[in-house]
């Protein structure tokens, strides 16, 4: 997916985007390509699909949550090179984002890119989530660990909810978490990303771009 296709999609989904935000989204590709020459932050293959596999995927959290993230304090756990935190920080400039990862080279990249984009609402820290002080309104993350492993890391860290990007067959994972933590199945909600992104949203893009989202979900608990 090229930027033009990405721009067409997000300007339909988020009607109040400014030119500044669009320029920030556009600049991301070259920044990650430059960093990937030094540090393999995202796979070489995924640099070709950065607008679909990374930006649009990250923004699907906003497609689900809509204005609930506006003006909030948000923790991105296991951010890696800055996903989903950096795209969400562009979309919600009035929200405060803390991006954490335990690997120093990844936080180096995320911090540099946030600074290059002029994102004053982003703080990047090298730390494990469970060691961070304080609470946040929301926790977000992208496929860092199973629910059984992830939930203890963020216990007591959020006031409202956890929003996770997941792929594949999520039902066994949800069932395992419900069993271990004695949660009712209805307390974990799953939302299919393709209920937000339809095939007609991909003008000029290959069918592969749309198909990639087929087994992608946002989970909230």
Please describe what each predicted stretch is.
Residues 94-221:
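S-adenosylmethionine
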Residues 9, 22, 91, 176-180:
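Alpha-helical structural signal in soluble globular domains
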Residues 1-71, 75, 105-108, 112-122:
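Class I SAM-dependent transferase core
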Residues 32, 88, 166:
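Residue-level signal for inorganic ion chemistry
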Residues 81-94:
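Conserved SAM-binding loop of SAM-dependent methyltransferases across substrates and taxa
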Residues 76-80:
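Conserved S-adenosyl-L-methionine
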Residues 3, 25, 29, 55-58, ...:
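A general structural signal for well-ordered alpha-helical segments in protein cores
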